A protein has these predicted regions:
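Short, well-ordered loop/turn elements at secondary-structure boundaries
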Residues: 10-11, 41-44, 90-94, 145-148, ...
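Active-site-proximal helix-loop-helix substrate-binding element of RNase H-like nuclease domains
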Residues: 47, 52, 57, 66-149, ...
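Conserved RNase H-like, two-metal-ion catalytic cores of nucleic-acid enzymes
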Residues: 1-82, 242-277
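General alpha-helical segment detector with a strong preference for membrane-spanning helices
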Residues: 9, 55, 103, 151, ...
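Conserved catalytic core of nucleic-acid polymerases
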Residues: 279-280, 286-329
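Conserved "right-hand" nucleotidyltransferase catalytic core of DNA-directed polymerases
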Residues: 114-122, 128-299
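Two-metal-ion RNase H-like nuclease active-site motif
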Residues: 1-8, 97-99, 284-286
Length: 329
């Protein structure tokens, strides 16, 4: 497993690689041949980065293909386009990439701060219009190495996520393989379930589970039923996406639940106090293991896009892995 990070300037590029298996570091500066040798010696390894799914892998592939990394950099950073759109030739360079960046995205410096690490960034301006000096190269290498080391820390903090993905791959070797490790969990699960894109246009044909015990908050369910009837009368399901999106955003129920102001809508529920709450004594934060997946199986709510019944096996595989991880701690 190799952790890596690229830095790109107009006239220079560099990268730091840390092979945690061999316990070796590689610093490559403006040397495509050296990069090619490293890649070819480790082409079947897992390359781990922070945002490498959207950035670093395309810089690396571009250099290996003889492209200008600055052009790729500006395509992604300045023009805000997807790296894969730059060239179909990227497909000629197979890489097993695993991205540590969470979804929704959070900057590496933010997580470094949470970990109590130094979050100072390099003083070298990425917009420099000339060759870097020796001192600027050294400073950039220093901060690039720091980011790779921090990426390793973040990976270890989130290793359960990697193990879960790897566990699914091991459980379904005929459907997915190690090259899929870089996909999101949702995408890997979709492959395992054999999901295909389908259009139902019946999002308001929902029902309320009989297990609901809302008591004094029954009016929240009534509000959703009222909105359901309203949407059906408008035939909203068959309207264009813009009309749907506008209607969804306009719907909201503001109420107080357990003394906390809450906002209900079709995107979910959010609750928070206007000011922080300070309490002393015993505080319990209770979570239910696999609550949502368990509910899907219990009430037959697994996605209709699935073409097989692998979901319970995915569920049991992940549950068994979590139990092993907890026992090992």
């Amino acid at each position: 497993m190799i952790f890596y990070d690229f830095e790109v300037f107009k006239e220079d590029w560099l990268a730091v690689f840390i092979d945690v298996t061999k316990k070796k570091e590689y610093v490559i500066i403006n040397n495509p041949d050296e990069l090619k040798a490293l890649y070819e010696a480790n082409s079947k390894d897992i390359w781990v980065g922070y945002n490498n799914r959207h950035y670093d892998q395309y810089i690396m592939k571009g250099i290996l293909l003889g492209m200008n990394p600055k052009r790729i950099n500006d395509w992604i950073i300045v023009e805000k386009k997807e790296g894969w759109q730059f060239s179909s030739a990227f497909n000629k360079v197979p890489m097993i990439n695993y991205d540590v960046m969470p979804n929704p995205p959070v900057g590496l410096k933010t997580l470094e701060g949470f970990l109590g690490s130094n979050i100072k960034e390099t003083d070298v301006d990425f917009r420099i219009n000339r060759k870097l000096t020796k001192e600027e190269i050294e400073m950039t290498v220093f901060y690039c190495r720091h980011d790779v080391e921090e990426t390793i820390k973040v990976f270890l903090e989130k290793i359960d996520e990697f193990n879960a993905m790897h566990g699914i791959i091991q459980a379904f070797p005929d459907i997915v393989n190690l090259s899929d490790i870089g996909d999101s969990e949702a995408r890997i699960t979709a492959k395992v379930l054999g999901c295909s894109r389908r259009s139902f246009e019946d999002e308001f044909d929902f029902y309320f589970l009989p297990c609901l015990q809302l008591k004094k908050y029954k009016y929240v369910q009534d509000w959703f039923e009222q909105k359901r009837q309203e949407a059906l009368s408008m035939d909203l399901a068959h309207m264009d996406k813009y009309s749907k999106r506008t209607w969804y955003k306009e719907q909201g129920l503001e109420t107080v639940v357990a003394g906390i102001p809450h906002s209900f809508g079709f995107g979910g529920v959010h609750g928070a106090t206007a000011t922080p709450i300070h309490k002393t004594g015993q505080l319990l934060h209770v979570d239910v293991n696999n609550y949502y997946p368990s509910m899907l199986i219990a009430w037959g709510l697994v996605t209709r896009a699935a073409t097989n019944d692998n979901y319970p096996l995915v569920y049991n595989t992940r549950k068994a892995m979590k139990e092993k991880q907890i026992a090992a701690k």
